[in-house]
Design a protein with these regions (language model features):
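Compact soluble domain cores
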Residues: 1-83
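A short, surface-exposed interaction/processing loop segment used at functional sites
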Residues: 90, 99-117
Length: 117
């Protein structure tokens, strides 16, 4: 089973702590939306929450039937995967984007969390 590659900064993005100026007009509102969703789903902003997300993403990158879109950009290949995330406080549909690395592993780039308010 291949492990999903998730850069540590992506956990900041998921838990409302993204910073910086790169794409700030998009990333800052999105990181706040992600934080609200993580809270609604009952995912703690700690190592246990990171493990929950890592385990979910490890499972989905090993399931070929959940790929809903693929594309190439600047000699890199990407895909969107659809999944149902079950948190301690509820469920949400994840549309996660992945860069396909040369060895076939997947590197997490972003996610759109759908469902709930």
């Amino acid at each position: 089973m291949k492990k999903a590659i998730i850069d540590l900064g992506k956990f900041d993005y998921l838990f409302g702590k993204a910073s910086g100026t790169k794409n700030a007009s998009h990333n800052l509102p999105r990181t706040k939306q992600n934080l609200a969703q993580m809270r609604r789903l009952g995912v703690p902003d700690d190592v246990n929450g990171q493990i929950l997300i890592q385990n979910h993403f490890d499972g989905i990158v090993n399931e070929p039937s959940n790929i809903i879109k693929t594309w190439t950009y600047k000699n890199s290949q990407f895909e969107i995967r659809e999944s149902l995330f079950a948190g301690p406080g509820g469920f949400a549909k994840f549309e996660s984007a992945w860069e396909i690395m040369s060895d076939g592993t997947r590197r997490f780039t972003t996610v759109i969390i759908k469902g709930g308010h």
